[in-house]
C-alpha cells in the first residue's frame, strides 16, 4: 500500500505540470483540436455525474468514492485537504493495481471483474468504458458486469448494445471514429476503441479505469501528449485510457499498431502508447516492463502475461532467425558455388596442360617423321646427272673428268654449243651412281680453269639454270626441243606437219608450237616440239634438212632465254634487211651483235641515245622484246 500511496501522490501532482510542456513541444494543430474535445468531454462528464448522483441510489461507500472522484477533478485546479487525498489514494490504489494489470497484458480474473461491478456505479464515464470492454471478452463474468452497469444507467445499456456490432470492424476505422467523435458520453469513443484491439487485457484496463474517479478520466485526457514518458504510466490507469484514445491518432502508422498488438498480446494499444511509448516498436522491452507491474498486482496475472506474450514472440524471432539462417545458407551456398567453380576451373586448367603436353609430343613426333624426308634431294635427284655452269670456254672433257675424279667416276659429259661449234659455257655431267653425284655436288663453287663452277642436281627445279638440264634425267616425262633453221616461207600448218613427221621417228610428239608474226602471220623461223621419249635421238637430228633448209635442234630453255636466243640468231639471214630498214623494231633485234657506233647516227635524231651515251643497243633490245612478247602471248 505504501508504494501505491506514493503513486497516488505523483498522480495528483504531475498531470497538470507534464501536459503543458509536452503539448507545446510535441503536439501539432491536430493535437490542439483533441484538447478542445477533451475539455468539452470533461464538462459534460461532470454534468452527467451530478445528474446520476441524484438519480441513483448507491451505498454511501460508493457515493463517497464517486464524490472523491468529482473532488479529484477539482483538485487539478484547486488542491484540497490531505484527507480527501487519502480517500482518493484508497480508490486510486485500486487504479494502480489495475494499471499494473494493464501494463502486464494478462487475462481477466473474476476478482477484478467484481471490483469493476462495484466501481461501475461510481461514475457514468467509467461505467461506459467498462461496458465497452466487456463485450470484447466473451465470458460470463463480463456479462454479469454488463448487467450491473445496465442497471446503473440507460446510456450504459445502449452503449453495451453498440459494442457488439462495432467489434468486428477494422481497427483503422475505429481509430478514425475515436478522433472524430466529440459526443457527450465517452462510451461511444470507448466502444469504438475496444473492438479495434480485440484483446483480453483491455477488459482489465477498463476495470482499472472504472475503479478510478472521474478525475482520472477527465484529467488524464489532457496529459495525453506525454506519450513517451513512463511517468504518465504510473500516474493513473484512467489517464492511460483517455490518452491512448488520442495517441493512435498522432502515430497513424498501421505497422506500429500491428507490432504492438503482436508483442503485447494481453495489453491494449492504448496502454502501450502511454505506458511504454518510448519503445512501442521494441517488443522485448514492453514485455519486460509489463512483468514487474504484474508482480505488484498478482502472481497469476504475471503468469498469464508471460504465456500470452511468449506465444506471440516466437513468430517474430523465428522470422528473424529464419532470415538470418536463410542469409547464412545463401552465403554458404554462394561460397560453396564459388569453391565448386574454382575446383572446376582447376580441373579444366589441368587437362589443358595435359593436352598441350600431348600436342608437344605429337609435334616432336611429326618433326622426327619429317627428318628422314630431308634427304629427298637424293631420292628425287636419284638421277646421276649434275648441271655444271660457269665453265671456261676452253674447257675439255678431260678437264671435267679430272676435276670430279675425287667425287666418283664420270660416265658422260655433255657440253652445250652453238651451231658454229662455239661453247655455251655449261654442260651436264653424269656419274655412275647418285651417291657419287651427291658427293660431286659438294664441290660447288670450286675453281675450275680460273672459274667458280656452279653445280646443281639436274632434276632439281629451283633455279632457271638447272631447270632445263634436269629434264634429261626425266625419262618418262615429256621434254621440249627447240628447232630453228627451217624455211619461214611455208605456212604454219605445213611447218607443223613436217616437224611432226620428221621427229616422230625419235619418239611420240605431243605438241608442236610454231610462233608467228602478229602483223604478217608468217612463221618466225623457229618452233618448239614436246617429246615423251626419244629426246636424245631428236637432238641427233640437228643439221638435217626440212623445207629446203638445215635445222638446228637443241634442248629447249625457258622461253625468255629462247626469245633472246632467237633474236640474237635470227639476223644471220635477215641482217641485210634489218640493217638498211627504216623499221626500228627489226633494226633493234640484231643491234647487240653490231658495233655500238653503227646505229648511233640513226638513233641520234630521236634523242633516245644522246642523253644516255650508251649507244643504240639497249633501246633496240627493248623494242625487240616488245615484239617478241606479243608473239609469245599468242602462243599461250
UniProtKB/Swiss-Prot annotation:
Which PROSITE patterns does the entry link to? RRM (PS50102)
| Residues covered by region (Disordered) | 1-386, 458-481, 544-636
Where is it chiefly localized?
A: nucleus
What ranges does the record list as Acidic residues composition bias?
Answer: 90-103, 122-133, 152-163, 182-193, 267-278, 299-311, 331-341
Q: Where in the cell is it found?
A: Nucleus, Nucleolus
Biased amino acid composition, Polar residues: 368-383, 464-481, 622-636
What does the entry state regarding organ or tissue expression? Expressed at low levels in flower buds.
The record's keywords, sorted A to Z, are: Nucleus, Repeat, RNA-binding, rRNA processing
**Where is this chain compositionally biased, Basic and acidic residues type?**
43-63, 76-89, 104-118, 224-238, 342-367, 552-566, 579-604
User: One Pfam match, by short name?
Assistant: RRM_1
> Looking at the UniProt record for this protein, which Gene Ontology cellular component terms does it annotate, in alphabetical order?
nucleolus
Q: Which GO terms describe its biological process?
A: rRNA processing
Domain of life, per UniProt, equals Eukaryota
Chain ranges of the RRM domain: 384-460, 479-558
Molecular function terms from GO: nucleosome binding; RNA binding
Other information: Disruption of NUCL1 induces NUCL2 expression.
* Subunit field text: Interacts with THAL in the nucleus.
Q: What does this protein do?
A: Involved in pre-rRNA processing and ribosome assembly.
From the Swiss-Prot or TrEMBL record, give the protein name: Nucleolin 2
Lineage of origin: Eukaryota, Viridiplantae, Streptophyta, Embryophyta, Tracheophyta
